[in-house]
UniProtKB/Swiss-Prot annotation:
Protein name from the UniProt record: Tyrosine--tRNA ligase
Binding-site residues, L-tyrosine: Y39, Y176, Q180
Species of origin: Rhodospirillum rubrum (strain ATCC 11170 / ATH 1.1.1 / DSM 467 / LMG 4362 / NCIMB 8255 / S1)
Tree of life domain: Bacteria
HAMAP family: Tyr_tRNA_synth_type1
Length: 418
């Protein structure tokens, strides 16, 4: 497209957020006229979102920053079914109680990125259970089922992948596409939403919603998707060998979150600064051009800005100071992940492998053995030569034992008084 007239599309284009759009010129014209309401849906399959959802959160962040209204759709209803998009198997079904708990945890994430309220551009959060729970099956099929072509739905990549692999796709999951399309229609009626955004895996679902709104209510709706984000080495964004990189501190300490960004591959620094921080693009260009050891300063800025957005400036500052103590001074810092043990248990001897797993430094005893054999397992900065080693009172320094896995991952065993 030519240079966008709307600030939102100009920002997200320049920062690398756009993958596909149903009508880019039409959307640009609409956004240029004044505030537009747009939404992204999030299913409640866990009590936190992880970094894999961050590009969608940042889209909503920039939408609000450029004068529009973000609508966060919580999938309290559709989570009971599960989105089959590009999954090898069905998701386990969750109870209503668990879905409610997960929604409460996810709500905490958005308060860092969006401003909620009653104003024209203040963010709102809605739950699709509010309208899906009351649907009557026969009237719903009569009024809306006729607008969906099964032939076409079978051509969507998300469905074809499962069928080509001869993996079962239940009727329950197949209905997810219809319900997501209905969400778009219902939000258009209730909140005036005109745009749905999402990841590239949601393209088929979004297009269904755009067409349903046009056929049923004559609405002019739009869809915009972001690209799948992978690292320079090809790894999927949001996952590490140690598990998901969660956005809630109850799931992942702010220090670990800071460290995740600090460990970004050199080739990804500029792209991640554009996508996951609000740094001006001229500053991003300057940092991206740094070479050699100087790129580490850019990584620290990436870690600081990303952690500030997710956890606040105080948590980011504490994490940076902890990292400085750990890596520059050899200290322990105050924000490292901790695991508490009783003094009596320590006196009896605690297996190193068990403590490495408890602190998240290793996923299994096999991984502990590998770390020991490679010289990567350390107690108080001293390499361990025996994977069967027991921790005892003699290892305690200043009330804690520092464990390390490699040069960049550390945790504390904190001893509770007897």
């Amino acid at each position: 497209m030519t240079a966008p007239k709307s600030e939102f599309l100009a920002v997200v284009r320049d920062r690398g957020f756009i993958h596909q759009c149903t009508d880019l010129d039409g959307l640009d014209a609409l956004l240029a006229k004044g505030p537009v309401s747009a939404y992204i849906g999030f299913d409640c399959t866990a009590d936190s979102l992880h970094v894999g959802s961050l590009i969608q959160i940042m889209l909503l962040h920039w939408l609000q920053r450029t004068g529009h209204r973000p609508v966060v759709l919580m999938g309290g209803g559709t989570t009971r079914i599960g989105d089959p998009s590009f999954r090898d198997e069905a998701r386990p079904l969750l109870t209503d109680e668990k879905i409610g708990q997960n929604m409460a945890g996810i709500r905490q994430v958005f308060s860092r990125f969006l401003s909620f309220g009653e104003g024209a551009t203040d963010a709102v959060m809605v739950n699709n259970a509010d309208w899906l729970d009351g649907l009557a099956y026969i009237p719903f099929l009569r009024d809306f089922g006729r607008h969906f072509s099964v032939n076409r739905m079978l051509t969507f990549d998300s469905v074809r992948l499962r069928l080509d692999r001869e993996q079962p796709l239940s009727f329950l999951e197949f209905n997810y596409m219809i319900l997501q399309a209905y969400d778009f229609l219902e939000l258009g009626r209730r909140t005036g939403v005109r745009l749905q955004m999402g990841g590239s895996d949601q393209w088929g679902n979004i297009v269904n919603g755009v067409e349903l709104g046009r056929r049923v209510d004559g609405l002019e709706l739009f869809g915009l998707t972001s690209p799948l984000i992978t690292t320079a080495s090809g790894a999927k964004m949001g996952k590490t060998a140690q598990g998901a990189v969660w956005l809630n501190e109850a799931r992942l300490p702010a220090y670990d979150y800071w460290q995740f960004w600090r460990n970004t591959e050199d080739a990804d620094v500029g792209r991640f600064l554009r996508l996951f921080t609000d740094l001006p693009l001229d500053e991003v260009a300057r940092l991206e051009a740094l070479g050699g050891a100087e790129i580490n300063e850019a990584k620290k800025i990436l870690a600081e800005r990303a952690t500030t957005m997710a956890h606040g400036p105080e948590a980011a500052l504490t994490a940076a100071e902890t990292a400085r103590k750990v890596f520059e001074q050899g200290g322990t810092g105050d924000a490292l992940p901790t695991h508490d043990v009783a003094a009596e248990a320590l006196a009896a001897g605690l297996p190193l492998a068990e403590m490495m797993r408890a602190t998240g430094l290793a996923a299994s005893g096999k991984e502990v053995k590998r770390l020991v054999s490679e010289g990567g397992a350390r107690i108080n900065d001293v390499a361990v030569s025996d994977a069967a080693r027991l921790l005892g009172p003699a290892d305690v320094q200043d009330g804690a034992i520092k464990l390390s896995a490699g040069k960049k991952r550390h945790a504390l065993i904190r001893v509770l008084p007897g």
